[in-house]
Design a protein with these regions (language model features):
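Catalytic histidine neighborhood in serine/cysteine hydrolases
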Residues: 138-153
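Alpha/beta-hydrolase active-site loop
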Residues: 2-21
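Extended beta-strand/beta-hairpin segments
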Residues: 170-218
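Catalytic histidine-centered segment of alpha/beta-hydrolase-like enzymes
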Residues: 150-162
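Alpha/beta-hydrolase fold nucleophile elbow
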Residues: 21-32
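Hydrolase active-site cap/lid region
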Residues: 46-94
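Short alpha-helix in the alpha/beta-hydrolase fold that links the catalytic acid
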Residues: 113, 127-136
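Short beta-strand/loop motif that positions the catalytic acidic residue
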Residues: 111, 117-119, 123
Length: 218
């Protein structure tokens, strides 16, 4: 059981943990209700370079209004489980009260990060008008790109890969690339270097000449 405000807080906490233990994330991507949470969280994370959303509702309450017939069960049972954005969410009275207090008009104008809004014009779960409202309410630089023929979960062949390519291409203009290794930092082909990170004594970072991997030795 969770609520929208807790989702936002989790994103902020995860960003801080990664910044403290590995490297500071530069790009925040969110889908559906997670996209709405990413938008609000981004207003509180100053180190972000860019934000991208996929099928995000303008008002988080919109995501549950699609299931209005089930929401009425909350009064009778206290909670109901719905599938939103491909995952099960328990909708309780507290969840609905939290959504009722969420006003995107109050925080979206404060988003000062480059924004990419991806949305399908035939999305039957979160309508394209949500993307238009997000675009209308946020500041530049911003871009709205339609994912033609895609469903809400991007399950049709090629749609998820297309969205990923769009985000990757668009974000390059804002992200700071890793410094290319030189001299002693270059790792020869066929060699891997492993070291324990400050994230914990069971966590290792393994580097090769082309990849960096994080492993758990527990």
């Amino acid at each position: 059981e969770t609520c929208f405000s807790e989702n936002v807080a989790d994103i902020i906490s995860a960003h801080q943990w990664l910044a403290d233990n590995y490297r500071t994330p530069q790009l925040l991507i969110g889908h559906s209700l997670g996209g709405a949470a990413a938008l609000k969280a981004a207003t509180s994370i100053k180190d972000l370079k860019a934000v991208a959303t996929i099928g995000a509702p303008f008002d988080p309450a919109h995501a549950v209004l699609h299931f209005a017939d089930r929401i009425s069960e909350v009064d009778a049972t206290g909670a109901v489980t719905l599938t939103l954005g491909g995952r099960d969410i328990t909708i309780s009275r507290e969840f609905l009260e939290d959504l009722a207090e969420t006003n995107p008009e109050s925080y979206l104008p404060r988003l000062r990060k480059p924004l990419l809004i991806l949305h399908s014009p035939i999305d039957q779960t979160v309508g394209i008008d949500n993307a238009q409202n997000i675009y209308r309410t946020t500041r530049y630089p911003k871009s709205l790109v339609t994912l033609n023929k895609a469903d809400h979960l991007l399950t049709k062949p090629g749609t998820a890969a297309a969205a990923a390519r769009m985000i990757a291409t668009w974000s390059q203009q804002y992200l700071i690339p890793d410094t290319a290794p030189t001299g002693a930092d270059v790792i020869p082909e066929g060699v891997a270097i492993s070291r324990t990170t400050k994230a914990g004594r069971f966590t290792d970072v393994v580097r090769t000449g082309t990849h960096t991997l994080y492993t758990d030795r527990d």
